[in-house]
């Protein structure tokens, strides 16, 4: 039976826990069902086609997942884009939220909370509405985008703006269920479905490399763990080289990788266009660095100027993505230099730019 356990001390957690009650470390899932290709429900064109590999009782769905995988060419090179910004609320967060909230609702949660700069909050509010739960989102008063706050409210979520929103949400978690996109292991489990879809869309094989923006690293780890499950099932030989790309404004993973550390250092945030990955201390930082080592991966940083140029190039290529989503493509010239022009590269386009365009 699948069980959440502490990543540090190994103690089991309760169903609604978001962190270890003993040592306050993050939680991992153990005894997950092995990946079974014969169990895929090929008539379900959502992430729930992998229901046999997702040990939660499905109660509701907004149809997230099964996003297109399409070729893109911009200055700097070619790649395959996984269009995660086409999920129901406009970001990859819907994968993790769908699995996490089905788990929490099945275990008695009624009031859920999270802290978010926008996308995770919109996703939580939408899926909570579908589940009949109430959702409250703590947003940073100084940086939250107005259009994203409007989206959270449109989905029925309540908003609390705070200058210390992390401290406030941790305090609120004493009485409400903390449905955290950073801490909850079921959120990361939901992200594995992106890897499984990519494998299917490529005809039952893995690409040579996968690049994502990295803040807390939920999608990055989901891709890594998803491909790891495929390797353990004997369906691929090698996990793709995982490429973590961060803004030069907040780049703890890049610094930890460059230093050969097991844990990213805490950094002082600097201004960045990539507001969705302004994370100075990733909850699963050690796991991200471990995944980089295991996959012979790369960790790269990009400047604001490159992010803006990449976003504009992607817009002209037909993909309206937000600045955070443009971070990996901003590193494309360097990625191609390191992995070669012929390597098959998948880049996740993580969030829609329509939300930010509406705010201009």
In which residue ranges do the predicted regions lie?
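PLP-dependent amino-acid enzyme catalytic core
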Residues: 1-360
């Amino acid at each position: 039976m699948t069980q959440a356990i502490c990543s540090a001390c190994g103690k089991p957690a309760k169903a609604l826990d978001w962190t270890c009650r003993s040592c306050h470390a993050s939680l991992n899932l153990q005894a997950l069902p092995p990946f079974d290709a014969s169990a895929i429900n090929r008539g379900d064109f959502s992430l729930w086609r992998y229901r046999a590999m997702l040990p939660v009782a499905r109660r509701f769905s907004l149809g997230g997942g099964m996003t297109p995988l399409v070729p893109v060419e911009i200055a700097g090179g070619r790649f395959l884009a996984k269009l995660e910004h086409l999920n129901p609320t406009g970001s990859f967060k819907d994968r993790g939220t769908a699995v996490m909230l089905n788990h929490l609702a099945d275990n008695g949660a009624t009031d859920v909370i999270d802290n978010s700069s926008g996308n995770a909050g919109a996703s939580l509010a939408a899926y909570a509405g579908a589940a009949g739960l109430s959702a409250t989102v703590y947003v940073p008063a100084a940086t939250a985008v107005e259009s994203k706050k409007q989206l959270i409210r449109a989905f029925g979520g309540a908003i609390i703006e705070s200058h210390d929103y992390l401290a406030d949400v941790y305090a609120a978690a004493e009485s409400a269920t903390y449905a955290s996109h950073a801490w909850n292991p079921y959120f990361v489990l939901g992200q594995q479905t992106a890897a499984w879809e990519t494998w299917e869309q490529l005809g039952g094989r893995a690409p040579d490399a996968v690049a994502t923006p990295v803040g807390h690293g939920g999608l990055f780890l989901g891709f890594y763990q998803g491909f790891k499950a495929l390797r353990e099932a004997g369906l691929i030989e090698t996990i793709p080289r995982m490429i973590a790309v961060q803004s030069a404004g907040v780049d703890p993973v890049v610094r930890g990788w460059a230093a050969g550390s097991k844990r990213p250092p805490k950094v002082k945030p600097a201004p960045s266009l990539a507001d969705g990955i302004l994370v100075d201390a990733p909850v699963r930082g050690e796991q991200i660095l471990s995944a980089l080592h295991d996959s012979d991966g790369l960790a790269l940083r990009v400047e604001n100027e490159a992010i803006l140029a990449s976003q504009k190039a992607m817009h002209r290529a037909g993909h309206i993505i937000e600045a955070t989503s443009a971070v990996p493509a901003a590193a494309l010239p360097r990625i191609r230099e390191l992995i070669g022009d012929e390597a098959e590269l998948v880049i996740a386009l993580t969030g829609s730019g329509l939300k930010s365009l509406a705010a201009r």
